[in-house]
Amino acid sequence: MLRIYAPASSANISVGFDTLGVAVSPIDGSLLGDVVQIEEIEQGFELESTGYFVRKLPKEPQKNIVYQAYVLFSERLKLRNLKIKPLRLTLEKNMPIGSGLGSSACSIVATLVALNQFYQQPFSKMELLEMMGELEGRISGSIHYDNVAPCYLGGVQLMVQSLGNICQQLPFFDNWYWVLAYPGIEVSTAEARAILPKSYTRQDVISHGRHLGSFVHACHTRQEALAAYMMRDVIAEPYREALLPNFAEVKQAVKDLGVLASGISGSGPTMFAIAPDLAIATKSATYLENNYLQNNEGFVHICKVDNVGARALV
């Protein structure tokens, strides 16, 4: 029996729409992510689901992304003339769906990593990552890697998708604390994409390029202040903030508390705030708990960058 954990991720990081993503883990040691267990059985295939958010999953197993990941992986095995083994997959669904924390990516990554290890790793990291992107595309409508890449590989990942590479890891600031606040409401990726304009002004395009280029440069040259200052979003946040509760007010409030940058995690509704120390992170977390959460399903976690990514649990 093998259990694989895949951590939560925050895509875009304000400045890198569809091109940046970061894996995160709570500093208290709790698991913010999905777990998939795999074990051999006598015959056939079985899929079971447990966990706090299991009630949010599709009722039909064929619509479960874990099942679809199993089917895709099996198809790729057949192309290599490898025998399909009878097995059971159990998804522990700990991530809220439509949260902006890479919920579907967690399930996809944990499943494919578990299957690859179960079959003695017939596929390379890039081959597995390509499958992950394809499965993400089935949910959001287009292939993208900004959640699955950091969830799988850890760290901050920049999507390059050229010269045989899907992504490259960026050097980052390990002293930063990531405060993640999920308000307890759902925003679908498809809905969040539909609200974006079909075209952008020349000035917005120039600003976006300047911000992203400067951010990447600042990461490589270890300029914290410049990196934080350039975490600005002219592509998605001005349009998506209408989907989030009291976003502008909350964003200003955490800035006043001393956070370096804040924004929408992925397509929302989770919000992230980056703090330079634990004291400011704690103050920001308390404020967000009292002013951003909308119901009992909401939560706030103080996190650090998860540099490991998907891994086996002992």
Curated annotation (Swiss-Prot):
Its main location: cytoplasm. Its EC number is 2.7.1.39. It catalyses: L-homoserine + ATP = O-phospho-L-homoserine + ADP + H(+). Gene3D superfamilies: 3.30.230.10, GHMP kinase, C-terminal domain. Pathway: Amino-acid biosynthesis; L-threonine biosynthesis; L-threonine from L-aspartate: step 4/5. It is found in: Cytoplasm. Catalyzes the ATP-dependent phosphorylation of L-homoserine to L-homoserine phosphate. This is Homoserine kinase. It comes from Histophilus somni (strain 2336). The lineage of its organism: Bacteria, Pseudomonadati, Pseudomonadota, Gammaproteobacteria, Pasteurellales.
